[in-house]
Amino acid sequence: MNIEEFDYDLPESLIAQTPLKDRDHSRLLVMDRETGEMKHLHFKDIIEYFRPGDTLVLNDTRVMPARLFGLKEETGAKVEMLMLTQIEGNDWEVLLKPAKRIKVGNKLNFGNGKIIAECIKEMDQGGRIMRLHYEGILQERLDELGEMPLPPYIKERLDDPDRYQTVYAKESGSAAAPTAGLHFTDELLTEIKNKGVNIAFVTLHVGLGTFRPVSVDDVNDHEMHSEYYQMTQETADLLNDTKSKGHRIISVGTTSTRTLETIRRDHDKFVETSGWTNIFIYPGFDFKAIDGQITNFHLPKSTLVMLVSAFSTRENVLNAYKTAVNLEYRFFSFGDAMLII
């Protein structure tokens, strides 16, 4: 399966640079998973497609203000550090700009010594493992010194950083937002609950691998980045009960989908668990967890386009994307949404 099969034409003008004033006023393209038939609504109308007994699964990860600007201690040269993943203790996988001159043993100084980062391992593509030294609580230091790490295709400054967080974000650890969840408001979630729909949470901390382009021609040769996930016993019990009663599980975002499918693949049911997943979902994948999913419109030739193609068909998804382009839907993180069901 060639990567070019997941390409599509997207005018740059359709890449949303800012969020809409009201989260749930974004547009919603509803696509039948089997037939590819489409309907065009607004996100707040999504409640029409939920049934009592369904369970909606949200990723409650919180984006860290993980972009730091500092100096190389030895030379005073300016450096930018983007924190990606906590490896263990105070050791983090990071991306550095410029990275070339940062070697093992070099130290970076942020906020006049409030955070010192020491390089302990060099990796490819500008990656490093850095050991952080700081006083107090890391989250407080990041809140003080860091900036929100917006995706590279968003060029405009974000006036309100909370707009790149879901309203239910709780577990800090992501380098990017689970963007399908950005459309929900507290009021809409209350309406959904009042209809008899269950709300469940999982956590998957989104790494920057989400934005890294696939660098191989043959999709089968691609290796996914690993991301940390966890599921509580409460969520596991609710999802198992949903399945046993013949109701539907609808995931919000590809991150929730990857978490749910990882756990069902590894355990044959939902269990309390945590770990790292590099599950790669592309056409031919056998879905065991979800019955529907909400997702944004993704980058051409990305693993996320492959995931949604696997849930329906490549032809259905690319036809929906072509329709969305023609109707001038907004694309990517701050863009509009799809419901595939």
Curated annotation (Swiss-Prot):
GO MF terms held by the record: S-adenosylmethionine:tRNA ribosyltransferase-isomerase activity
List the catalytic activities from the record. Answer: 7-aminomethyl-7-carbaguanosine(34) in tRNA + S-adenosyl-L-methionine = epoxyqueuosine(34) in tRNA + adenine + L-methionine + 2 H(+)
| SUPFAM superfamilies in alphabetical order | QueA-like
The broad enzyme category this protein falls into is transferase
Under the heading Pfam families, the entry gives: Queuosine_synth (PF02547)
Highest taxon listed in the record's lineage: Bacteria
Any one cellular-component term (Gene Ontology): cytoplasm
Q: Which InterPro entries match?
A: QueA, QueA_dom1, QueA_dom2, QueA_sf
As for what it does, the entry says: Transfers and isomerizes the ribose moiety from AdoMet to the 7-aminomethyl group of 7-deazaguanine (preQ1-tRNA) to give epoxyqueuosine (oQ-tRNA).
- Recorded protein name is S-adenosylmethionine:tRNA ribosyltransferase-isomerase
